[in-house]
Curated annotation (Swiss-Prot):
It catalyses: (1E)-4-oxobut-1-ene-1,2,4-tricarboxylate = 4-carboxy-2-hydroxy-cis,cis-muconate. It comes from Pseudomonas putida (strain ATCC 47054 / DSM 6125 / CFBP 8728 / NCIMB 11950 / KT2440). It is an enzyme of class 5 (isomerase). It holds the Pfam family PrpF. Its EC number is 5.3.2.8. The gene is galD. This is 4-oxalomesaconate tautomerase. The lineage of its organism: Bacteria, Pseudomonadati, Pseudomonadota, Gammaproteobacteria, Pseudomonadales.
Amino acid sequence: MGQTRIPCLLMRGGTSKGAYFLHDDLPAPGPLRDRVLLAVMGSPDARQIDGIGGADSLTSKVAIIRASQRDDADVDYLFAQVVVDEARVDYGQNCGNILAGVGPFALERGLVAASGASTPVRIFMENTGQIAVAQVPTADGQVEYAGDTRIDGVPGRAAALVVTFADVAGASCGALLPTGNSRDCVEGVEVTCIDNGMPVVLLCAEDLGVTGYEPCETLEADSALKTRLEAIRLQLGPRMNLGDVSQRNVPKMCLLSAPRNGGTVNTRSFIPHRCHASIGVFGAVSVATACLIEGSVAQGLASTSGGDRQRLAVEHPSGEFTVEISLEHGVIKGCGLVRTARLLFDGVVCIGRDTWGGPEK
C-alpha cells in the first residue's frame, strides 16, 4: 500500500520544534485526525523512530492553522501536543514557543501578505480563545529569519520576533488565580495556582526537599519527588477548574528558588512529569506574573523592581526567559516577549495510506 503525502512545514518556534499544517490539509477534527498526527510524529513509540518527532515533548508538537473568519484576527491557530509514548493528542493548552512560528507560517503559506519591514499577524489561539499579535520581520517582502537575537536554549542567533498579548489571564482556568487565593496549602506544601496563559502550580523547591538548582537529570531520577508533585497536581486540577487532569498535560508544576544569575526568580518546570530543559513561554509568563502578586509563593523569592512596565527574567536550566509585563495602577494589563523562529523544511510528510488516504477530491 502506498503513502499519503501531506503538505507540511517543519519549524523551530522559540525553544520547541513542530510540524505546521494548513487546517484543510488534514482530516476534520476527531479520532482520524488524531491518528494522522500520531503517525506523523511516530507515537506511541518512545523513540518516535517511524515519524518526525524527536522523542521529546519539545519536538512532538503540531500547529494547525487557517485563515480566520474573525474580525479581530488574521489566522486561527490550534496547538496539538502529541504525547511521545502514548497514543494520545492533547489540545488542552497553548504553546507559546510554537506560536512564534505561526506568523512566519501564515506569510509562507500566503494567508497574510507582507507589509513593510515588519508585518503584524493577529493570531486567534483556538485552544484558549485569546488573541496574540506577532510582529514578523519581513525585509524585501519575505520572512526574514536571519538576525542577531539570541534566546537561551537555542544555538546561534536569528531575527527577533516580538509577540504581545493583551489578555491571557484565566485563559484555561477562568481566572488569574483560579482558586481565588494567592496561596493555598496542599499536602502540607504551600502553593500558588496561577493562569496567565498557562495553568501553573508554583512551589518553593526547598519545601519539596530539593534546592531547585539541580540539573534536570537529577530531578528526573527522583521518583519520590515526582510522585509527590503528581499527587499535588491531581488534587489541584479540580480546584483550578481543570477537572480530572490525570490524562492532561496541565497544570504544569514549577519549583521556585531565589535567582542565581541576576534574574528575577529561578525555576525547574515539569511538563507535567518530565523536567523541562528550559521553560515554556506561557509558563514563564505565569511565573513572572506571580512574582508581582502579593502573598504568592514567588514573591518572597523574587527580585523585582517597581514601575508600570517591568521586565522579569525567569531563570531556567538553559538560561533565562525575559517577560515584559504592563501594569496599570498595580493591575496586570498585558505582557510581551521576544522569540525567534526558523523554517527547517517545506515539503510533505508521509504516512501510510492505511492510516488515511488523504483529502477527498
